[in-house]
A protein has these predicted regions:
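Hydrophobic transmembrane alpha-helices of secondary-active transporters
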Residues: 33, 55-56, 81-102, 237-239, ...
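Alpha-helical membrane segments and immediately flanking helix-loop junctions
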Residues: 80-81, 90-95, 110-120, 124, ...
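Entry/N-cap segments of selected transmembrane alpha helices
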Residues: 101-122, 273-300, 351, 355
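Alpha-helical transmembrane segments
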Residues: 160-177, 288-295, 319-322
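Transmembrane helical segments that form the transport core of multi-pass membrane transport proteins
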Residues: 216-300
Length: 379
């Protein structure tokens, strides 16, 4: 009887005896993510559930990520199938206004230039010895687009899902900190003071309706393996612009997006178990992700300088920094920096065009990369 009681009591301390130091480290990291989300307002909709999921999965013997476990069920249902990131893309499309990029088509080029960091980081990751699939997943952090990162990682490098997702969303929230020093370093005082004329053009409803259809068809033909990414964001935008399915549009950008974001974030946190996450490669991945986003900004601003030269000084190179997918955060950074040097400068609409172009550019970059690698037989 006494032995049975002692055995029963030993079950109460089993969790403590199986606690590994790496679990404690990850619990602390989960706590830091909660702090950043709540106190610092860094992407709270993502970092709060990711942080809590991270804490949960590092409690020993709970078996949350074992077959049939609570977190494993959610993970298999929405992440492995890529359903969650694609549903979020429909919501993003429903919330995105491509009007600014249609008013100023040249800003679409800036959105493309802002993706070069992806490919440069991919090459660097390969040079450091990462396998092809891992290098692609690390490079895609430069898309500065969480759902794209999650989609690629869930397909080709599930073991990196936690690190690359945390890197993507953390650095997205740090865009207002990361971009201004790079913008100032690469531009002159004269360039930063350029006042751009705002031409108020009216984009017809027909154009706005045709845009997502044309992009889906052309993008799908060029890079068919990335079509799910491109088609879902364009579907959301088409529903918004049509005005015929207001209930679906509202549900996509509110209820569906909120529920899926919660489940997706918890699932990502569930991949951050101590023995898997606490490795030297994680630090390298975080460093490469930071480099990718910085290189995006560098390439965008440098291309902005090219346009400044070509147009005889009519384009402010700062708007090139908005060519990433952090929408509309990056456009606001450009507006703030421009007004800091010239109170008469109003760059927001031009920057919003580049930013909207970056939304499409990041998805197209991922789609092209996946299709090229598929054609080479690498993935």
């Amino acid at each position: 009887m006494l032995d049975a009681m002692l055995s029963g009591l030993s079950g109460l301390v089993a969790g403590f005896t199986h606690l590994h130091w790496s679990n404690l480290v990850m619990m602390c990291i989960g706590g830091i993510l909660l702090y950043l989300g709540i106190k610092k307002d860094f992407e709270p909709l993502l970092l709060v559930p990711i942080g809590f999921g991270c804490i949960m999965v590092n409690i020993p013997l709970a078996d949350l990520m074992e077959k049939g476990g609570f977190l494993r069920t959610i993970y298999d249902f929405g992440v492995i199938t890529e359903l969650f990131p694609l549903l979020i893309f429909i919501g993003i499309g429903a919330m995105t206004d491509f009007g600014p990029v249609l008013e100023n088509p040249y800003t679409f080029i800036l959105g493309a230039a802002g993706q070069f960091g992806i490919f440069l980081t991919l090459l660097l990751a390969l040079a450091l010895g990462f396998p092809y699939k891992d290098a692609v997943t690390i490079g895609i952090i430069g898309a500065c687009d969480g759902p794209t990162v999650i989609y690629v990682a869930s397909q080709y490098a599930q073991h990196l899902l936690g690190p690359v997702t945390v890197a993507a969303y953390s650095y997205m929230s740090l865009v207002p900190v990361l971009q201004p020093p790079i913008m100032r370093m690469l531009t002159t005082q004269k360039e930063r003071e350029v006042v751009m004329k705002t031409h108020q053009k009216t984009v017809s409803k027909t154009t706005k309706l045709l845009f997502p259809i044309v992009i889906t068809i052309i993008g799908g033909l060029i890079a068919p393996h990335g079509l799910p990414l491109l088609a879902t964001i364009m579907l959301g935008n088409f529903m918004k612009e049509s005005g015929a399915v207001a209930r679906l549009t509202k549900a996509s950008e509110n209820e569906i997006a909120n529920i899926v974001t919660l489940l997706l974030a918890i699932s990502i946190g569930a991949t951050m178990s101590g023995p898997v996450f606490v490795k030297p490669t994680t630090i390298i991945i975080l460093a490469l992700g930071l480099l990718a986003i910085c290189l995006d900004t560098v390439c965008g601003v440098l291309f902005g300088k090219v346009l400044y030269f070509v147009t005889g000084g009519k384009i402010n190179p700062l708007i090139g920094a908005a060519g990433i997918s952090a929408f509309p955060m990056s456009a606001r950074v450009v507006q703030r920096e421009g007004q800091k040097y010239n109170k008469k400068s109003y760059l927001l609409m031009h920057a919003m065009g580049a930013n909207a172009g970056g939304q499409v550019g990041s998805v197209m970059a991922a789609a092209v990369m996946l299709s090229v690698l598929k054609g080479m037989g690498i993935i």
